């Protein structure tokens, strides 16, 4: 028997997570993301988010 109402709700999946992972696997994109943010770094390397 599970006490589902006691746990935190499941977080909604992040639609940008697959793109974030692509950027993290590219050392240059990952480094740039640390400075200017993931979305801008991804845009510079791969185009529109």
Swiss-Prot record:
GO terms for cellular component: cytoplasm; extracellular region. One of its GO terms (molecular function) is hormone activity. SMART domains: GLA. Gamma-carboxyglutamate residues are formed by vitamin K dependent carboxylation by GGCX. These residues are essential for the binding of calcium. Decarboxylation promotes the hormone activity. It is found in: Secreted. GO terms for biological process: biomineral tissue development; bone development; brain development; cellular response to insulin stimulus; cognition; glucose homeostasis; learning or memory; negative regulation of bone development. Ca(2+) 1 binds at residue 17. Transmembrane segments: none annotated. Ca(2+) 2 binds at residues 21, 24. SUPFAM superfamilies: GLA-domain. Disulfide bonds join 23-29. The modification 4-carboxyglutamate is found at residues 17, 21, 24. Keywords: Biomineralization, Calcium, Disulfide bond, Gamma-carboxyglutamic acid, Hormone, Hydroxylation, Metal-binding, Secreted. InterPro entries: GLA-like_dom_SF (IPR035972), GLA_domain (IPR000294), Osteocalcin (IPR039176), Osteocalcin/MGP (IPR002384). The keyword DNA-binding does not apply. The modification 4-hydroxyproline is found at residue 9. The carboxylated form is one of the main organic components of the bone matrix, which constitutes 1-2% of the total bone protein: it acts as a negative regulator of bone formation and is required to limit bone formation without impairing bone resorption or mineralization. The carboxylated form binds strongly to apatite and calcium. PANTHER family: OSTEOCALCIN. This is Osteocalcin. It comes from Macaca fascicularis.
């Amino acid at each position: 028997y599970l006490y589902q109402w006691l746990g935190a709700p499941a977080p909604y999946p992040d639609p940008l997570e697959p793109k974030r992972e692509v950027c993290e696997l590219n050392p240059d994109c990952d480094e740039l993301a640390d400075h200017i943010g993931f979305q801008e770094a991804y845009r510079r390397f791969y185009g529109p988010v």
